[in-house]
Design a protein with these regions (language model features):
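Generic serine detector
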Residues: 18-21, 80, 104, 210
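Metal-dependent catalytic neighborhoods of phosphoester/phosphodiester hydrolases
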Residues: 1-3, 80
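Active-site loop/turn elements of alpha/beta-hydrolase fold enzymes
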Residues: 21, 72-73, 110, 162-165
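Active-site acidic/histidine proton-transfer and metal-coordination neighborhood
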Residues: 11, 26-130, 215
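Glycine-rich, aromatic-flanked loop segments that form ligand/cofactor-binding clefts
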Residues: 5-27
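Histidine-acidic metal/acid-base catalytic patches
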Residues: 3, 10, 92, 100, ...
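Hydrophobic residues within beta-strands of alpha/beta enzymes
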Residues: 17-19, 68, 160, 202-203
Length: 230
């Protein structure tokens, strides 16, 4: 499958910037079950998630994709929390495997505050660990304003998900994802700030719905972002 993907990417001139690792399930994206089911934090799913990420690293190597990315989970804010130390060790295991495959590992923003993610990356202590900066997730999880988060995460931003969303108002559920330009992300200011920190990698449009509306929203977002980028 990796060889077929590589052939198709080359044939159609598509750049695959990362291979995304998800699952194994369950993964519940809310504020109650999320901490218990997402990423490398939950003990009962951790080994299976590590194995999945390692398998994705093998796939990325075989397909010529430079990075693996995924959610690490609701990383505890307290660095003395045993779950924090265990999660850092799990990230290190994944990142070491990626490094053997000459791939980077990107932690997707969302469930943790930016400074907690920086702390975890530094405690992992490997130079192939970075961030996939999902600007809407920071808002939808209520963790940060993405403009401010750039200041914290700048040295580690390797990829960017262009997505838009709203802050949560229901304490159980995430804020809503909305089409780019209809949410709280200030894309003109964000793109300018990314330029200032020297970010020149792709902006990957993400619209997590399906069907014709997804296609229409992605095309509209592409046109909007191209005008901003110039």
């Amino acid at each position: 499958m990796a060889a077929r993907l590589r052939k198709a990417l080359d044939q159609y001139g598509v750049e695959a910037t990362s291979a995304v690792s998800t699952g194994p399930k369950p993964e519940v994206y809310d504020f109650y079950q999320g901490p218990l089911t997402i990423g490398l934090v939950p003990r009962q799913y951790r080994q299976a998630r590590i194995a999945r990420m390692q398998a994705v690293a093998d796939f990325a190597r075989n397909a010529g994709i430079p990075a693996v990315q995924g959610h690490c989970g609701f990383i505890p804010e307290n660095p003395s929390d045993e779950l924090y130390r265990e999660t850092v060790a799990a990230i290190r295991t994944v990142a070491e495997y990626c490094r053997k495959n000459r791939r980077s590992f990107r932690c997707e923003t969302g469930q943790e505050t930016p400074i907690t993610l920086v702390r975890a990356i530094r405690d992992v202590g490997l130079d192939n660990v970075g961030v996939n900066f999902d600007v809407a997730n920071l808002i939808m999880y209520g963790k940060a304003n993405p403009l401010d988060a750039v200041d914290v995460l700048a040295p580690y931003i390797q990829g960017v998900h262009a997505k838009d969303g709203l802050y949560p108002t229901d304490p159980r559920n995430l804020g809503a994802e909305v089409p780019i330009g209809e949410g709280k992300v200030n894309f003109p200011a964000l793109i300018e700030k990314l330029r200032r920190i020297g970010y020149h990698n792709p902006l990957t449009i993400e619209r997590e719905i399906s069907g014709e509306k997804q296609r229409a929203d992605v095309l509209k977002a592409k046109a909007y972002l191209e005008k901003l980028i110039g």
